[in-house]
Each structure stands twice: as C-alpha cells, then as structure tokens.
Amino acid sequence: MIGAAESFEERLSVSSWDRRQGKLAVFGCIDEESGVFNREYLLFQLRENLSTFNRYRIPFSVLCIQVDQIDHFQSAHGIRAVDAIQHAVAQTLGNSLRPTDLLGRLSERTFLAVLTECKANEIESVAKRLTKMVSYTEIKWWGDKVSVTASFGGYCFGGGRHG
C-alpha cells in the first residue's frame, strides 16, 4: 500500500511532501490552515494540466474530496477540532499521493487532488486507497482519539467519470 495515515504526534523526519510545501509557502502558494496548496495555486496548476492535455492528450484526473458529516463533527467537537481534523486529512492525503500529483484546498470544506497521467480505469482504485487512508487518520482531542471518513468524486480528462 502506498501512503500513510497520519497520527499527529511528533515526527522526526521531513517527507518530500513537507519539503515541497515549505519551498512553495515562501511564494504564497500554501493554504495556512490545511498546509496544502491554496485555491489560486491549485486552479493555476489545473489550467496547466488542461493545457497539456489539450496539446498532447496526456490524461489526468481530478478527485474532489470532502470530509463526511463535518457539521455534525463541528457540533460534537467544535470549530477548532474541525480545523485540526481537516489539517490531518490534508496531510494524510498529501503524503499518500505520488510526487507528481498535487493536492489543494478548493474551498473551506473541499480538497481537490490533481492526479497526473491517471486514466479513467485507475481513478477508482486511487479513490478507494485514499478513502482507506483518511479513515485511519485521527487526532487527539480533549483526551479522545477522533477520526472521520471522506467522500470522493472524480473525473478523468481523457475519458471517464467516477463518483
């Protein structure tokens, strides 16, 4: 299995994801709350992928990701817990993608993954793997370990839809 769920306790090593994010934070490309690419950078990269697809017909896919029942989670644990779990989910997703893929925060409650050279027949297995990784993600909140699930919808540029 590629990727890893995050349990946000002290980490000693810095992943390639963290190094890449650190470099781009200097240029204002990172969403401060989630630690992933911000909407502007995400949309820029999406336009670049569309341009490449139109020119060279290299397929790519996008996955729209939402944490399930976030309003219920907020009622039970508060807005700070929502921010913490969204950050944990974002880091888990980012660390579970290939180095050529990217993850960004599309809106307050939605992430978008751009999967390079991912064909229609591959997107479902990627979504299933990421769903599993998110389900293992947990945070400690007021002495409790809390976790969430996520829903995915996807589209492949080069043919096919999922979700």
Where are the predicted features?
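Residue-level detector of beta-strand structural context in well-folded domains
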Residues: 101-102, 137
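Catalytic strand-loop-helix junctions within cyclic-nucleotide turnover domains
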Residues: 114-123, 142-145, 150-163
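A short pre-motif secondary-structure segment
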Residues: 102-105, 146
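Regulatory sensory/coupling modules that transmit signals to nucleotide-handling catalytic cores
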Residues: 1-22, 125, 132, 136-138, ...
